[in-house]
Amino acid sequence: MIDDITAQLRAGRQVLEALERELAGRIASFAELLADSLAGGRKLLVMGNGGSAADAQHFAAEIVGRFKLERRGLPAVALTTDTSILTAIGNDYGFDAIFRRQVEALADEGDVVVGISTSGNSRNVQEALLLARERGCRTIGLLGRDGGSIRDIVDLDLTVPSADTPRIQEGHITIIHIVCDLVEKRLFP
């Protein structure tokens, strides 16, 4: 059991080291893009399925509430939280439309729309990101594995270099925390 724990912790460290080596510049670009958008009166929309839905909610909570600094709330919406909206859209239009329909209703030009997908192939996330781009939003993918089909349709992809879902999710939440920290420091010096 201890060997398994040690192996998992080692694998987690390797992913974090890869983020530093391979994605630091992209993380900085993501933070700058989001800070500029929020400073300009725009909002963050974020989505994902399963564990990525939880990460979307976590991200929105840090932006609306606070991360580390006492500050005013900033506009962010997790498109994963309203069961009535999700089930109505899913029932009437299908599961692939649950995020796209919300982007249609809520996204404005200049907003930042983030799709989180460990595979990079979540169809409902992909469809929403495509519509967001059509509407003039900036699109970001927090992805895993090889980035999947989403990698090619977003303005900026942050693909965690791992094929192991738990390690990808750990990479995503680390990126989210770093971005929240950088956004707060930039907007509330």
Curated annotation (Swiss-Prot):
Localisation: Cytoplasm
Molecular function via GO: carbohydrate derivative binding; D-sedoheptulose 7-phosphate isomerase activity; zinc ion binding
E.C. number: 5.3.1.28
Cofactor: Zn(2+)
Segments forming domain SIS: 34-189
Additional remark text: The reaction produces a racemic mixture of D-glycero-alpha-D-manno-heptose 7-phosphate and D-glycero-beta-D-manno-heptose 7-phosphate.
Assembly and oligomerization: Homotetramer.
UniProt-recorded name of the protein: Phosphoheptose isomerase
Gene: gmhA
